[in-house]
UniProtKB/Swiss-Prot annotation:
EC number(s) reported in the record: 7.2.1.1
Gene expressing this chain: nqrD
Top-level EC class as recorded in UniProt: translocase
Single GO biological process annotation from the record: sodium ion transport
Pfam families: Rnf-Nqr
SUBUNIT field: Composed of six subunits; NqrA, NqrB, NqrC, NqrD, NqrE and NqrF.
This protein's name: Na(+)-translocating NADH-quinone reductase subunit D
Key words of the record: Cell inner membrane, Cell membrane, Ion transport, Membrane, NAD, Sodium, Sodium transport, Translocase, Transmembrane, Transmembrane helix, Transport, Ubiquinone
UniProt-listed HAMAP family: NqrD
Lineage: Bacteria, Pseudomonadati, Pseudomonadota, Gammaproteobacteria, Alteromonadales
Function: NQR complex catalyzes the reduction of ubiquinone-1 to ubiquinol by two successive reactions, coupled with the transport of Na(+) ions from the cytoplasm to the periplasm. NqrA to NqrE are probably involved in the second step, the conversion of ubisemiquinone to ubiquinol.
């Protein structure tokens, strides 16, 4: 049974020192598409975190009964089932957001973070540790999404969660929104800037020059 220190390390590590986007450069595609608003970034964070944590848990529970030759198929079946449940819940209780997220919730099935943690961690680790690892990686992914979404919505539209924060010139205010920040390429540059800042602050994350 894992002790509290190990569980904390597995949970906090992917958020701070081993972030799946900032360090491993995984899950970037969806991060470009869903971060124009804080609302969609938050819902995507919750969706991926739930799928990653629960898929890790279920895969770990049956890991000793999965034949090696079909393990990827079993993993994808579990992940796909969870994604379908999450998608149906979103359509039932947050239909407008589900429409905005479009295919990106469905694409969680093939998300590198979810598949990677299932194969590299859940197949070799007890259930509780696997659950915490999935939770940590989902939150690490979400931390980047919410950071990028904050900048894009605030300075691209002058609002957060649809609530006006910076009074726009078109409404008699002082702020001229930067429409470029609402385009997907802006997220690419913001994520790049975040990675640069993190690696300046944590030089040990810089890849060795070969």
């Amino acid at each position: 049974m894992a002790d509290a220190k190990e569980l904390k390390s597995v949970l906090i590590g992917p958020i701070v020192s081993n972030n799946p986007i900032a360090l491993q450069i995984l899950g970037v595609c969806s991060a470009l598409a869903v971060t124009s608003k804080m609302e969609t970034a938050l819902v995507m964070t919750i969706a991926l975190t739930a799928v990653c944590a629960l898929s890790n848990l279920f895969i770990s529970l049956i890991r000793n009964h999965i034949p090696s030759s079909v393990r990827i198929i079993v993993q994808m079946t579990i992940i796909a089932s969870l994604v379908i449940v999450v998608d149906q819940v979103l359509q039932a209780y947050a239909y407008d957001v589900a429409k905005q997220l479009s295919v990106f919730v469905g694409l969680i099935i093939t998300n590198c973070i979810v598949m990677g943690r299932a194969e590299a961690f859940a197949m070799k680790t007890p259930p509780m540790m696997s659950f915490m690892d999935g939770l940590g990686n989902g939150l690490g992914y979400g931390a980047i999404l919410l950071s990028v979404g904050f900048v894009r919505e605030l300075f691209g539209n002058g609002s957060l969660f649809g609530i006006e924060i910076l009074s726009k010139i078109s409404d008699g205010g002082w702020y001229q929104p930067n429409g470029l920040l609402l385009l997907p390429p802006s997220a690419f540059f913001l994520i790049g800037a975040l990675i640069w800042i993190i690696r300046v602050m944590k030089p040990e994350q810089v890849e060795a020059k070969g």
